[in-house]
A protein has these predicted regions:
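Mid-to-C-terminal alpha-helical segments outside catalytic/metal-binding sites
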Residues: 1-6, 11-71, 101-109, 130-134, ...
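Hydrophobic faces of well-ordered beta-strands that scaffold small-molecule active sites
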Residues: 4-6, 72-75, 115-118, 144-146, ...
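Catalytic metal-binding/acid-base residues of hydrolase active sites
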Residues: 9, 180-181, 214, 233, ...
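Aromatic- and acidic-residue-enriched segments that line the glycan-binding/catalytic groove
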Residues: 14-27, 90-92, 132, 161, ...
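Active-site gating/metal-coordination segments in enzymes
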Residues: 70, 75-209
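Alpha-helical structural signal in soluble globular domains
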Residues: 102-109, 134, 138, 163, ...
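A general structural motif
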Residues: 207-210, 246-248, 267-271
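Aromatic-lined glycan-binding groove of carbohydrate-active enzymes
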Residues: 214-260
Length: 335
């Protein structure tokens, strides 16, 4: 059975190397072991990308050894998506363009199994639109990474972004909403070796960002907007009733839970019960297989998904059919 991992991360080494040459923040530095540590501001480490993030050939080799056939991937930026929206406009533009070119190069090199997604510098709306148009139109990337925060103004529901969402809807490409390690990295989750942040902070961040898309009316004004909220939709499906109970001030024409159910999600729980609830809440047609690799190991994701009580036809949708439809995948990739 064909498998497409819709939540996969590959970090091009040349991108991190370029960021390590910055003298101002945000920047990164090599860890001496093939990875990089990223810093948003002085003394605050926001993410550590180990060597496992940087070697695409070895990532494919690992998946090929799972004895599940060839596993294809859709590569997204993960927490790194925020960086190009925190740089000065011109530098953010050039950085995003460089990222997108590297993704397109990987699509050409691994045309039978790799699709890339676009970086956009949201600190400037028109620049973001121009970069996105180039990434989707010229380079053939299949999705757009939407960071949960944007530079000095960390709200993705800002009215100035309305033309951006207009264009995303026109292009009919999915937004991948992923936590950025920027909102809850300090007082909220300090201590315990980063456990509070990794287990709760990221989930809260992606949930708050998705909620803003609902309460601001972005989802209402853009009925054809497709948003993949990673990590089984954060807390949204579990708290849908509270959204409906408390959502009156937003004055939406529908209950907030209706907009939540419009989202797509993946199966990065990681637990069998979490997967089961995501499937029941969002419905089979809005769930894609994903692992968050290398943050989570695909063999564990596969074992948990094997426990799900779904039909063969639905299993095929989740493993590949839904991703092919959502991202409008073609194979081999033609760039």
């Amino acid at each position: 059975m064909r498998i497409i991992d819709s939540h996969f991360h590959w970090q091009p080494p040349e991108i991190s190397d370029a960021l390590s040459k910055r003298t101002e923040f945000p920047r990164c530095e090599a860890d001496g072991q093939g990875g990089y540590r990223f810093y948003r501001k002085a003394g605050v480490k926001s993410a550590h990308r180990t060597a496992a993030w940087y070697d695409l050939d070895r990532q494919f080799e690992y998946m090929d050894n799972l004895n599940r056939g060839k596993i294809d991937v859709i590569s997204s930026m993960g927490p790194f998506s925020v960086f190009y929206s925190e740089l000065p406009v011109d530098e953010g533009r050039e950085g995003a363009l460089a990222w997108n070119e590297v993704m397109a190069g990987a699509q050409r090199k691994f045309a039978d199994r790799f699709w890339g997604t676009a970086a956009v510098p949201l600190v400037d709306t028109q620049v973001a639109i121009d970069v996105m148009n180039d990434a989707i139109g010229r380079l053939g990337l299949v999705g757009v990474n939407l960071p949960c925060s944007i530079g000095e103004d960390p709200l993705i529901d800002h009215p100035r972004l309305e033309p951006f969402y207009d264009r995303v809807e026109e292009l009919d490409v999915p937004l991948i909403l992923h936590p950025t390690d920027s909102l809850y990295g300090e007082d909220f989750s300090k201590g315990y070796g980063g456990t509070l942040h990794a287990t709760l902070g990221r989930v809260v961040e992606v949930s708050a960002a998705a909620t803003r898309l609902i309460l601001s009316g972005v989802m209402e004004r853009h009925p054809n907007l497709k948003v993949l909220v990673t990590h089984v939709g954060g807390v949204l499906p579990y708290q849908a009733g509270r959204y409906d109970k408390n959502g009156g001030p937003a004055k939406l024409p529908e209950p907030p839970s209706n907009y939540i159910k419009r989202f797509y999600t993946d199966l990065v729980a990681p637990s069998a019960l979490g997967m089961e609830f995501a499937l029941k809440f969002f419905g089979v047609d809005h769930v894609t297989y994903g692992t968050d690799y290398p943050c989570w190991m695909p063999h564990e994701a596969l074992e948990l998904f094997d426990q799900q009580d779904v039909s063969q036809a639905d299993r095929e949708k989740i493993f590949s059919g839904n991703a092919m439809k959502l991202f409008k995948l073609r194979q081999p990739v033609a760039v």
